[in-house]
């Protein structure tokens, strides 16, 4: 299928009675590098590097513009040739149309009410990505499946395909429904932190086997700190992590943190063994609208994250999915200062479900955390009273005047983003 377009073009030329020169002379179009990328010796991620163009560099596409495994064959300014993945470059026509976005150029972050758990569907004009697929029980999983079926019934153009599934860490409230999703829909790629143990180890093992059996693209061994180190302060990306390439406004997806195999300065043994600190941190940009997902990352890892990116703007975002369901250890002043978010969304259960593993039992979200978030969030909202936890199984009322939302308060929450950075919020209750 991948080679059908070039064959059709060649056939059309023959019908017209035209002779054509070698591919490198028949077609030439300059493209601009959108973000730092590796030009490779062959059209595959495992091949050697030729060079490392930076954003703004221009390359010339060869081979009639055909792609091989998602890679363009390109010529560099110094005459060398290599292969670059198509999501890292922009054609002039794309630049022209991106400047004036169309009515359909909208992204939506669907924060799905999973009770005490997490699942966020990112909807783009040309694809969809899922971050986590966990909930407190099978009822939450039923809701996720129903939500996704309704979504794809509306977005028939996506053909029941999730371009990538990310699981931030191996806890059951983040991957309980993972296999149900994988078996119900087509999965284009799978990314996790590679940690085999934790309360979500059974879904993690089942998904690992499923990925291998179905040849689903993945990051072998999971995203780890060595990969993040090699990416520098740009974050880790590539065709598996960022598989969505829309023609007018192209989303940018990066992983900013992954698994730690060794302690960082200031970490205790307990910090390293804590699965929450191994959470993937995912940054998504759609035009000027930027989102950050920190999983269940706690204070030691958060401080390491802030330190790593202190000289970049990658943590400066508009929407934050609050870490660790609004637990006090998932929110820090330094992270809030680095983000300066316009709004925040907490994925947590409601305070009226008095059961094991519930928001009520854990005491989520904590008053201290909500207070810090409300002080940092820039957008205001009409005053509304919500229940917050003063401790496990102890709740009282908090009056929100800032744009802080929670699935336990508001149900399913949609944050719609336009390329110019305009954000609107709707919820199911």
Question: What residue spans do the PLM features occupy?
Answer:
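Active-site-proximal loop/helix segments of hydrolase catalytic cores
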Residues: 111-120, 125-158, 166-183, 256-360, ...
């Amino acid at each position: 299928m991948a080679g059908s377009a070039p064959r059709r073009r060649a056939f059309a030329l023959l019908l017209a009675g035209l002779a054509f020169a070698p591919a490198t002379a028949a077609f030439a179009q300059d493209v601009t590098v959108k973000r730092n990328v590796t030009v490779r010796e062959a059209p595959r991620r495992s091949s050697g590097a030729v060079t490392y163009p930076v954003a703004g560099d221009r390359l010339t596409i060869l081979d009639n513009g055909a792609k091989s495994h998602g890679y363009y064959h390109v010529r560099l300014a110094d005459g060398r040739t290599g292969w670059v993945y198509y999501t890292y470059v922009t054609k002039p026509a794309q630049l022209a149309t991106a400047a004036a976005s169309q009515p359909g150029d909208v992204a939506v972050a669907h924060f799905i009410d999973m009770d005490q758990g997490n699942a966020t569907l990112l909807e783009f004009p040309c694809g969809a990505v899922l971050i986590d697929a966990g909930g407190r029980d099978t009822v939450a999983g039923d809701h996720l499946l129903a939500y996704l079926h309704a979504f794809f019934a509306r977005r028939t153009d996506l053909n029941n395909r999730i371009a990538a599934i990310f699981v931030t860490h191996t806890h059951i409230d983040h991957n309980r429904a993972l296999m149900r999703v994988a078996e119900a829909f087509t999965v284009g790629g799978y990314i996790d932190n590679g940690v085999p143990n934790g309360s979500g180890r059974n879904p993690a093992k089942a998904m690992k086997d499923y990925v291998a059996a179905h040849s689903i693209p993945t990051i072998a061994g999971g995203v780890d700190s060595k990969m993040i180190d090699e990416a520098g302060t740009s974050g880790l990306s590539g065709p598996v992590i960022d598989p969505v390439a829309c023609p007018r406004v192209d989303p940018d997806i990066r992983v900013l943190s992954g698994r730690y195999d060794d302690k960082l300065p200031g970490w205790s043994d307990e910090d390293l063994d804590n699965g929450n600190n191994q959470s993937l941190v995912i940054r998504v940009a759609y035009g000027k609208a930027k989102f950050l997902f920190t999983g269940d990352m706690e204070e030691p890892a958060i401080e390491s994250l802030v330190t790593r990116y202190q000289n970049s703007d990658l943590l400066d975002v508009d929407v934050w999915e609050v870490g660790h369901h609004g637990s006090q250890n998932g929110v820090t002043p330094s992270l809030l200062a680095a983000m300066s978010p316009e709004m925040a969304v907490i994925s947590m259960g409601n305070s009226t479900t008095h059961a094991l593993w519930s928001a009520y039992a854990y005491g989520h979200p904590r008053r201290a955390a909500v207070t810090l978030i409300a002080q940092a969030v820039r957008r205001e909202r009409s005053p509304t009273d919500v229940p917050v936890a003063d401790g496990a199984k102890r709740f009282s009322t908090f009056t929100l005047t800032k744009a802080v939302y929670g699935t336990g308060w508001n149900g399913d929450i949609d944050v719609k983003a336009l390329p110019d950075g305009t954000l609107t919020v709707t919820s199911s209750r």
